Amino acid sequence: MNSLYTAEGVMDKHSLWQRYVPLVRHEALRLQVRLPASVELDDLLQAGGIGLLNAVERYDALQGTAFTTYAVQRIRGAMLDELRSRDWVPRSVRRNAREVAQAIGQLEQELGRNATETEVAERLGIDIADYRQMLLDTNNSQLFSYDEWREEHGDSIELVTDDHQRENPLQQLLDSNLRQRVMEAIETLPEREKLVLTLYYQEELNLKEIGAVLEVGESRVSQLHSQAIKRLRTKLGKL
């Protein structure tokens, strides 16, 4: 780490930039796989580069936050801001996501337990196949919850990444009270949905690998993930 400081003990911003440029590509590739093919990698890289530049310029080691943690916030946030500015998610998909979350919340409040897919589909007035397709569509749009957290809770609650661990938008929240609520809410999820979140965010398995564990296809894993995120949103909204 000494190479990042000048002889006078001042952080060398140029060296910091050079060392962490690969992080921009890493985050861009992780994000791109969850986005429509129309989203270009170069656009994400450009936005992420601006985010890294902001991180280099604004980082204050005295605040006690590791630079990697801070940089990931800035890089990923810049990429999401770019996506948001283009409004790439169709309004119908946003509307469906809200309707699904609302139906789940209403049912679980009425039933006092986790609602089944069939029950949610019936509440929405659609068949199970259409409901599962809706889950797929909304899962592709929600950026695995990061953007949804920012929309609901604002920039005052940031997602953070440990230096040695993949970014985890469900558990690593700066606000300790909210983190505890998230963990408690995850424990109440149906076992398969809880397992999907654990395998993806903690064990770092991809959708294909998770599908092999559950003996289902990737699309089914995506549906389970989408439903789990929506359950968490409704559960956290009641806490």
Curated annotation (Swiss-Prot):
One Gene Ontology term from the biological process aspect of the record: DNA-templated transcription initiation
Cellular localization per UniProt: Cytoplasm
Region (Sigma-70 factor domain-3): 96-166
Entries under CDD domains matching the protein: Sigma70_r4 (cd06171)
Superkingdom: Bacteria
Coiled coil: none
Name of the protein this chain belongs to: RNA polymerase sigma factor FliA
Cytoplasm recorded as keyword: yes
Note: The distinguishing feature of FliA promoters is a long -10 region (GCCGATAA). The upstream GC constitutes an extended -10 motif and is recognized by Arg-91.
Domain text: The sigma-70 factor domain-2 mediates sequence-specific interaction with the -10 element in promoter DNA, and plays an important role in melting the double-stranded DNA and the formation of the transcription bubble. The sigma-70 factor domain-2 mediates interaction with the RNA polymerase subunits RpoB and RpoC.
InterPro entries (alphabetical): RNA_pol_sigma-70_dom, RNA_pol_sigma70, RNA_pol_sigma70_r2, RNA_pol_sigma70_r3, RNA_pol_sigma70_r4, RNA_pol_sigma_FliA_WhiG, RNA_pol_sigma_r2, RNA_pol_sigma_r3/r4-like
Region (Sigma-70 factor domain-4): 185-233
Region Sigma-70 factor domain-2, annotated ranges: 16-88
Phenotype seen when the gene is deleted: Mutants have poor biofilms (decrease in biomass, surface coverage and mean thickness).
Positions of the DNA-binding region: 207-226
Stored PANTHER family: RNA POLYMERASE SIGMA FACTOR FLIA (PTHR30385:SF7), SIGMA FACTOR F FLAGELLAR (PTHR30385)
Source species: Escherichia coli (strain K12)
Function: Sigma factors are initiation factors that promote the attachment of RNA polymerase to specific initiation sites and are then released. This sigma factor controls the expression of flagella-related genes.
SUPFAM superfamilies to which the protein is assigned, alphabetical: Sigma2 domain of RNA polymerase sigma factors, Sigma3 and sigma4 domains of RNA polymerase sigma factors
Family as reported in the entry's similarity comment: Belongs to the sigma-70 factor family. FliA subfamily.
One family name in Pfam for this protein: Sigma70_r3
Molecular function per GO: DNA binding; DNA-directed RNA polymerase activity; sigma factor activity
Motif (Interaction with polymerase core subunit RpoC): 43-46
Annotated signal peptide: none
Any one annotated GO CC term: cytosolic DNA-directed RNA polymerase complex
Keywords tagged on the record: Cytoplasm, DNA-binding, Sigma factor, Transcription, Transcription regulation
